[in-house]
A protein has these predicted regions:
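Interfacial/gating helices of multi-pass transporter permease domains
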Residues: 59-63, 99-103, 107, 125-149, ...
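Specific pore-lining/lateral-gate transmembrane helices of multi-pass inner-membrane transport
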Residues: 140-254
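Helix-loop interface residues and adjacent transmembrane-helix termini in multi-pass membrane transporters
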Residues: 14-15, 59-60, 132, 169, ...
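Membrane-proximal transmembrane or re-entrant/amphipathic helices at the cytosolic face
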Residues: 322-356
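Membrane-interface junctions at transmembrane-helix termini in multi-pass inner-membrane proteins
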Residues: 2-26, 85-88, 225-256, 298
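Residue-level signature of transmembrane alpha-helical cores of multipass secondary-active transporters
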Residues: 21, 25, 66-70, 74, ...
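Hydrophobic alpha-helical transmembrane segments
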Residues: 22-85, 255-261, 274-294, 337-344
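Interhelical loop/hinge segments that connect adjacent transmembrane helices in multipass membrane
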Residues: 47-65, 69, 78-118, 161, ...
Length: 356
């Protein structure tokens, strides 16, 4: 079902109907969440009261309820999309199909490599730690990794919005300058998120990590955030191979990133424990970002203002690491740094807007 609605969702993004896109996505999540609450909380309540619904007789394992909720939400989304299918119509074009396959197959390979980057840190932690500790350490690591959700949400929203924008401007003679400006905006805001989360992490931990036993693992958070920032920059820098139909480069870069993930985890976890896994993720995404930049500037030069971008990234990273690892995490000092960064970001964004 999710595959069948991929093209309609892409059409909404391409046509700039971001509100409609968001409405459907939020509706899907709301239905899914509501059904999970119904199945996993209300149904057991009814069962304890002696009520048995027909659906309860068909489900033997509670995990089946999760699958069922997802299936119903996806089915409703597909039904909602049906009028769009009728409006667009169907036309089989073998030449277009070949072009789509040539473009999309490397993206599929890149997606597999991305899954390696995202999941193998836990695999290696479990493999390299003693069996008696592995489950507890993976739980601690995964619990603290959730603090990267702020950067992840920003990157996801950015990627969903920026890719249709990149393609719609590909034919414009000023496209490289536009891409450079968008990347500068991303760098400024992503740097702000990095600093903000690092400064207020002792407040966020109460919300996202209720298990106090996991708090000792918060030391991984700056590297998780920096890794996600590098991933976001990679998505922005990867415009060159997407708009020029050279997606095989995306597969190559992602596979290299997967290789870095494997080697770095095997090397660093025995030295630094689960902290090594977070550093490995940062090295993998950082390597992919730099590789995409290096190759891209030779294949499709874009005039990125690296002096300004680098200044904000260095400022944000330096302040975040110093506050988190060197200082005593004084909230007043951290808040002053956040306000100072916000002021500089405001001035820079205002200046970039006024540039022609």
């Amino acid at each position: 079902m999710d595959t069948l609605v991929a093209i309609p969702f892409a059409w909404y993004r391409y046509s700039g109907q971001s509100l409609h896109y968001a409405f459907i996505k939020i509706g899907n999540v709301t239905v899914n969440l509501g059904l999970n609450l119904l199945f996993l909380l209300y149904f057991p309540f009814l069962e304890n009261k002696g009520y048995r619904l027909p659906l309860m007789e068909l489900v033997s394992d509670k995990t089946q309820y999760i699958f069922l909720a997802n299936l119903i939400a996806s089915l409703l989304t597909f039904i909602y999309m049906l009028p769009l299918y009728k409006r667009i119509g169907f036309l089989w074009d073998i030449a277009l199909w070949k072009r789509l396959f040539q473009y999309a197959f490397p993206v599929l390979i890149a997606g597999i490599a991305f899954s390696i980057n995202e999941a193998f840190d836990r695999v290696f932690i479990r493999m390299l730690y003693p069996a008696s500790l592995a489950d507890a350490v993976v739980g601690l690591y995964a619990g603290c990794y959730k603090m990267g959700v702020f950067m992840t949400l920003f990157i996801t929203a950015y990627k969903l919005g920026v890719e249709p924008f990149f393609f719609s401007n590909a034919a414009d003679k000023n496209a490289p300058q536009t891409y450079a400006k968008v990347t500068e905006y991303f760098s400024i805001f992503a740097g702000g998120i990095l600093l903000f989360v690092c400064v207020y992490i002792d407040l966020f931990k109460w919300l996202l990590i209720p298990n106090r036993a996991y708090w000792e693992g918060l030391k991984i958070v700056p590297f998780v955030l920096m890794a996600n920032l590098c991933l976001g920059l990679y998505h922005s820098l990867s415009v060159w191979y997407k708009v020029t139909d050279r997606t095989h480069w995306g597969a190559i870069i992602s596979l290299i990133g997967g290789g870095i993930t494997i080697v770095a985890n095997l090397s660093l976890i025995p030295l630094w424990g689960y902290m090594g896994a977070a550093v490995a993720t940062f090295l993998a995404y950082g390597g992919m970002m730099l590789l995409s930049l290096w190759i891209g500037q030779r294949k499709y030069p874009i005039p990125y203002p690296w002096q300004r971008i680098g200044s904000f990234l260095l400022l944000s990273t330096g302040l975040s690491l110093a506050y988190f690892y060197i200082g005593d995490r004084n909230l007043f000092v951290g808040s002053t740094a956040v306000v100072g960064y916000a002021f500089l970001a405001y001035k820079s964004v205002k200046r970039v807007k006024n540039e022609k």
